[in-house]
Amino acid sequence: MTYKKSLGNVSTKYYKMKEDLQLDTGNILETPTIAYETYGKLNNEKSNVILVCHALTGDAHAAGWHDGDKKPGWWNIIIGPGKPLDTNRYFIICSNVLGSCKGTTGPCDINPKTNKPYGLDFPIITINDMVKAQKKLLDYLDINHLYAVVGGSMGGMQVLQWTITYPDMVRNAIMIASGAYSTPQQIAFNAVQRRSIIEDPNWKGGKYYEEGVSPEQGLSVARMIAHITYLSNESMYEKFGRKLQDKNKFSYDFSTEFQVESYLEHQGSTFTKKFDANSYLYLTKALDYFEVRKNTSLEEALKPVKSRILIMSITSDWLYTHEHMEEIVMALRANNVEVSYSRLNSEYGHDAFLIENGQMNYIISNFLSKARVKDVMSHTTLTLDYTADIKEAAELMMNCNKTHIPIVDDGKEIVGIITAWDLSKAIATDANSIDDIMTKNVLTCTEYDSLHKVIRKMKEHNISGLPVIDKNHKVIGSITTAHISNLYEK
C-alpha cells in the first residue's frame, strides 16, 4: 500500500545495553533494552540527526506504518518526506522511554534477578534517567551531535533536560507544551490517577502479572482523568456540547447519558488494552519529580544551555500554560540564549501539538530552516604554521586527503590558506616558502553565520569549503559543501 507523504512501512529496533544504567536515585538498572525507530538517511558527517522525544504514553513508533496498523505513528503529521522533520534531509530517531511498556525496559519486563516481572521492584526513574538512556542509544549508534532534539509534553521535559545534561551535543531544541518543573496542580492530577490504579483490587500490590489479572478499572479511570486535562473547555463544547448519547431525553439515573461521558469511557477502556498500569505509575511519578531548578533559580538552572531553542505554547492548554512556558523563555533570554517563542492558536487544548499540523508545520519548518554554521560544522580541522615549508604542506595534504589547509601565526590566528592549486603553482614558479604562494585575503565564516549566507558565499567564489573562525580570528573548525548538502539538497 502507498501512503501519500508517508514513510510507508517501518519497523522497531531494539538495543540491549552491555552495561548497567546508573539511575539518579543511586539504584542500578541491569542492562536495559531500548526500543527505537529511525527514519531517513544518516549523512556522512552525521550532522543531520534529530531526536524525537515522546509524551507520557507514547512509544518509538512516531511515523510510518507497521504491518497491520490502522493508523500511522503518533507524529506522522510532522515526520516524513517534505514535512517539518523532513526525512529527505534529516535522520530521525525516536526511542521509547525507560519505564514504559512499549519495548524499552519497564516494570512489566522480566527482572533478571528473579526471572519474574519487575512489578514494584523496578526502580524509580526520572526524566534525566530517560535522557541518559537515550544518550546510551546514541553512543551505540556512534552519534556525537544532535542537529535538533524535539518533543511535546513529557517529551518537552526530555528536550529541556537534554540541553542541560548534554549541552555540547545539542545544536537546536524544540520544546512544545511542557514545563521546567511539574506544578502542584499537575502533581495533584497525577496523584489521583495513581490512586485509582492502586485502589483497584486487581492491582495486587503491583504483582498482578503473576495472577493473570490487570487493574483495568483503575487504569481506565486514570486515563479518563488524564484525558480531561488534555482537552479544553472550548474543544469539549465543540465536540460534545451537552448532547446525549443514543437518547433524546434524560433517564434520571446513573447510566451514561452525555456524549462526553461515553467518549471518556471509550478512551479509558481502549487504553487498558495497550498500556501497563505499573508503567503508568512510574511515568507519572517521573513527571512529578521533574524540577530543573533544584533549589536554585530557573535562570541559574538553565546556565548550561548552549543550543538555539524554540519554545512553543498552546493558547488553550491549561495543563502547561503559556505563563509557565514564558517563564522558561525569560530565563533563557536572561542567559543570552538564542530563543524563539511561538504560541499555537488552537482550541484543542494540550493535545493540539498532536493535531494542528498546519501551524506546527510552519513554526517548526521556519525554525529549523534558520540553521547556522555551528549546527553542521566540523569542530576539528587541520592547520599549518606559517613557518612550515612547502614540502610539509604537500605531505600533510597527501596524508590527510585534504585540498586546502588554513595557515596560522604564532597566536593561532588565521593569516592565509594554501590549496592544492597553490602547491602546483609553487612547482611552476619555483617558490621557496608558503608565504610566497598562500592566499592571504582568506574567505572565512563564523559559527553563528547562517547556512544560507555560507552557501551563497561558496557559490559566488566557486569554493567547496570555508575555515570557521572565532572573534579573535582563530580557526575553530571548518565547513564544506559535504557538511550541508544533506540539509539543503533534495
Swiss-Prot record:
Catalyses which reaction(s): L-homoserine + acetyl-CoA = O-acetyl-L-homoserine + CoA
InterPro entries listed in its UniProt record: AB_hydrolase_1 (IPR000073), AB_hydrolase_fold (IPR029058), CBS_dom (IPR000644), CBS_dom_sf (IPR046342), HAT_MetX-like (IPR008220)
Active site per the UniProt annotation: 153 (nucleophile), 317, 350
Coiled coil: none
Pathway: Amino-acid biosynthesis; L-methionine biosynthesis via de novo pathway; O-acetyl-L-homoserine from L-homoserine: step 1/1
Sequence positions that bind substrate: 223, 351
Biological role: Transfers an acetyl group from acetyl-CoA to L-homoserine, forming acetyl-L-homoserine.
Subunit-structure text: Homodimer.
Annotated protein name in UniProt: Homoserine O-acetyltransferase
Species per Swiss-Prot/TrEMBL record: Methanosphaera stadtmanae (strain ATCC 43021 / DSM 3091 / JCM 11832 / MCB-3)
